[in-house]
From Swiss-Prot:
Catalyzes the phosphorylation of pantothenate (Pan), the first step in CoA biosynthesis. Its EC number is 2.7.1.33. Pathway: Cofactor biosynthesis; coenzyme A biosynthesis; CoA from (R)-pantothenate: step 1/5. It comes from the Bacteria. The gene is coaX. It is found in: Cytoplasm. This is Type III pantothenate kinase. K(+) binds at D129.
Amino acid sequence: MLLAIDCGNTNTVFSIWDGTQFLATWRIATDHKRTADEYHVWLSTLLSLTKIEARISEAVISSTVPRVVFNLRVLCNRYYDCRPLVVGKPECRLPVAPRVDQGTTVGPDRLVNTVAGFHLHGGNLIVVDFGTATTFDVVDADGAYIGGVIAPGVNLSLEALHMAAAALPHVDVTKPQQAIGTNTVACIQSGVYWGYIGLVEGIVRQIRLERDSPMKVIATGGLAPLFDQGFNLFDRVEDDLTMQGLVLIHQYNKDLE
């Protein structure tokens, strides 16, 4: 079985792929101090609790946190006797090479998302990912990543507001009933929610103008469903887009062997 690992700035997600479907998906807070042994104990406990008899023999990793990759490699080598494929490393090939400025480093999660997006929905595509950052990644008709946009993430914006303004509380993002808030919490929630609706609409509109194409739009990330409530911002929300991309990239590299 394949162990797919997506390490983001906030959370690290582990999924077990049996060749046809994901048997389980778990997440843990990203911590560069967490050892391979700790990962193994955590994974083994979850596998036991869910009664999944997973004989992991392969692994693929995408990580936006370089310091975590070493211990994830050790986890795969020591406990699953496999050498993981790491997206972004020279040994990892992509179906279509990115078409960006020479020397540009593209986050592996963004590349993984575009591979999955193209596979599922074809080219001329915008992938919006609501993560620690809110990213917009553009795929051309051939399936190549050609660039995108990076904006502060929703929760990051809320945290920054709370940290910079002593009188403003930390609040959870939710869809407000109206734009005009009648208390401080409602005002913050309204500003963030409607602000990000406008952000998505504006950036998508500008990308379409620059590409002179209608461009399909898909969204992923934990907060994507919250912004998909009656606004027709997205053609589709894909909950496990990154994991699907990791599986596709792993299979593509196996086929090249």
